[in-house]
């Protein structure tokens, strides 16, 4: 009878080890992805700084273009119709009493 309990314990521990290994691998994968995202953000910021430094003379012209784009975006604000609201956010559905679900 002791042989069966030893085998069961060995199987159980192997199963536990496999589950633990899977969890560790998942956690390591998440950390790696997070690290990559942080590196990408840092690299993106460095690239923007380099571009700004290289474009020294063109900097004034770019500002004027940016201001023109901003002015176009700031046009008169109008209220959306109910149809446009539904199209803009199709995930929202209204319940019978009118509240969002």
Swiss-Prot record:
Phosphothreonine (modified residue): where? 52
Cite the record's Basic and acidic residues compositional bias ranges: 13-37
The protein's UniProt keywords, in alphabetical order, are:
Acetylation, Immunity, Phosphoprotein
Q: Which residues carry this modification: Phosphoserine?
A: 2, 5, 13
Its GO biological process annotations read: immune system process
**Which stretches are tagged as biased composition: Acidic residues?**
38-74
Span list, region Disordered:
1-101
Q: Which residues carry this modification: N-acetylserine?
A: 2
Record PTM N6-acetyllysine, positions in chain: 4, 15, 91
Q: Which family does the record claim for this protein?
A: Belongs to the pro/parathymosin family.
- Describe its function: Parathymosin may mediate immune function by blocking the effect of prothymosin alpha which confers resistance to certain opportunistic infections.
This chain's protein is named Parathymosin
